[in-house]
Amino acid sequence: MRQLLPGDTVWRNIRLATMDPQRQAPYGLVDNQALIVREGHICDIVPETQLPVSGDNIHDMQGRLVTPGLIDCHTHLVFAGNRAAEWEQRLNGASYQHISAQGGGINATVSATRACAEETLYQLARERMMRLASEGVTLLEIKSGYGLELATEEKLLRVAAKLAAENAIDISPTLLAAHATPAEYRDDPDGYITLVCETMIPQLWKKGLFDAVDLFCESVGFNVAQSERVLQTAKALGIPVKGHVEQLSLLGGAQLVSRYQGLSADHIEYLDEAGVAAMRDGGTVGVLLPGAFYFLRETQHPPVELLRRYQVPVAVASDFNPGTSPFCSLHLAMNMACVQFGLTPEEAWAGVTRHAARALGRQATHGQLRAGYRADFVVWDAEQPVEIVYEPGRNPLYQRVYRGKIS
């Protein structure tokens, strides 16, 4: 009989989808196991016959499914306003590029967000965060990018820090100052990039407000040369990087980000084979964002078969934002990734667990159920992981465990 230490907590009579690639079964499934949690981490996974049947800190889950906590590795959670009117314009024939050129798009949200009080932004973002938590999300990336000036970018990152301080969910904050050219720099995008590189990145990094730097390399964002200035600045300071690339056209953004060993290249609908090879060589995760693909009614699919062939890890995220993916649901993103992009349900699960963890640089601690990893997991009223992907309108979450505590 396995001896437990005071303070140990056990979840027994469970079916574990460990998402551990070292296990041979699909989803890393193992039956009739018990999960021992100690000091917020998984201490061990053992056959349940090695443990007492009952006790003060022993939870009998009656055969329920347990998975790692979900990870949403790409969101724009902190913003004010909405862009419903733009959506109607697009449905009446206007393109995303045309709307952006007329001062809409990202800059419309920038105006609303700059004018919004920090406490109001916090309350709006907190409600969105808790919606994701209710689906089993335990680690969440939050980008800035709706300030496009030092003061408001800092305000957005402070909101992310305040959300993290609640200890309800892990937050990975990302500086996305190179999201768009603000109206006041419309005729001088290079000047804005200078502001980002010489002021925003170093000052906000010194304050410890973000974990990584992101950028938007696209015809409606920044060109390759401007994007590289951002990457060079970040890497000179030792900051991990990532990029929104190849969403609407092929500019070579994936190759650029991979050359700087980027954590991830996101969107990637127009990614070509050279870009896929560069991602493999750079250790860069491909992040699929099917919500934006759906909402913009795009037709160019990301090259899933090429990503498989080159063994590039593929993550899936909600891309929750007011303009192009107003879907605060990782379950829906998983379903869309399967239906629209052809992922298997197991690939979708890997995309919101171990590969999403890698996209945030957390692969050594998050995204799998194995000894030494964080005790962030979800108990589901389900028999198979596919059920969560198959029916996104139904949430079979039974229990969410964060840092070893039922939350």
Swiss-Prot record:
Reactions accelerated catalytically: 4-imidazolone-5-propanoate + H2O = N-formimidoyl-L-glutamate
Any one Gene Ontology cellular component term annotated for this protein: cytoplasm
List of residues binding N-formimidoyl-L-glutamate: 146, 321, 323
Keyword Iron: yes
SUPFAM superfamilies on file: Composite domain of metallo-dependent hydrolases (SSF51338), Metallo-dependent hydrolases (SSF51556)
Cofactor binding note from Swiss-Prot or TrEMBL: Binds 1 zinc or iron ion per subunit.
Pathway(s) this gene product operates in, as recorded in its UniProt entry: Amino-acid degradation; L-histidine degradation into L-glutamate; N-formimidoyl-L-glutamate from L-histidine: step 3/3
Binding sites annotated in the UniProt record for Fe(3+): 74, 76, 244, 319
GO biological process per UniProt: L-histidine catabolic process to glutamate and formamide; L-histidine catabolic process to glutamate and formate
Cofactor(s) named in the record: Zn(2+); Fe(3+)
Binding residue positions for Zn(2+): 74, 76, 244, 319
Family classification: Belongs to the metallo-dependent hydrolases superfamily. HutI family.
Name of the protein this chain belongs to: Imidazolonepropionase
Species this protein is from: Salmonella paratyphi A (strain AKU_12601)
Biological classification of the source: Bacteria, Pseudomonadati, Pseudomonadota, Gammaproteobacteria, Enterobacterales
